[in-house]
Each structure stands twice: as C-alpha cells, then as structure tokens.
C-alpha cells in the first residue's frame, strides 16, 4: 500500500519497517510475564483481536498521515505480532518431549509458512477483487477495504483460541 497506493519510495517504505522490528524486539522480554499473569487462553484471545484491529486500522492510513503516527502504528503492530507468534509457538511446543521437540518444531514451521502463504494469497485476491470493484483510480480504497477484511478475518480466528483450557499452565 505504501508504495503502490501512496507512491512512496522503496527506501522510505523500508525505513518504516524499522519501528515494526523495534516493536517485535521490545515485546520479547515482556511476553513471558504477560503469559504467566494472564494465561495462554486470555493472551491469545485478546491479542488475536488486537492484531486484527491493528490490521484493519491500517485502513485509516492515508498518504498524508504523519510519519510519527505511521511509526507508532508499525511499532504497535510489531509488538502485537511478536506476542502472537511467541505465544502460539510456546503453547504448541511446551508439552512435547525432548525427543519430539525437533519434529514438532519442523511441523509448526511448516504450518506457519503455509498459513503465511495463504494469507498473502488471500490479501492479493482481496486487493484484486476490490481493485476491479472500485477501479484502478481508487487503488487506496481497494487496499483499505482489503485491510478491513483481513483484520476481520483475523478477529474471527480468535475463536480457535477459545478452545484452550483456561487453566493451561505456562
């Protein structure tokens, strides 16, 4: 969206990934205490909804959005994304024996790559659909509509985490 719809230079767009990475790094030391305090179920349910809302809120971004606001938005998204992935990874692997940990990690990596591939394909399909619907002269609207759809889909997936027993140990 930043390059295609807003016309930003690749270098500028790349610089905006720095706050995302910083958010991810910032979250690392706080994830374990958060999970210990609130539990996997609550963290994953809440965080999935927050990630979805954050994705959808990218639709509020325009070419005129101040850089400091974009940086904060990307920082928050990086933080939430990191909390999500670390929580899912540790929940998935925590009860595996040492013998099964390697296979479990490989299987988890494959599932994550598959889900990311499906996400990219879905995003491309939505952008294509909305570009055809709104026309190429309204590319920003097509991106915004796609982001809202992707955010809503992400929020719906929180239902999966409602199946985690509330007393799941850390």
Task: Set out the residue ranges of the language-model regions.
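12-transmembrane solute porter fold
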Residues: 1-133, 138-168
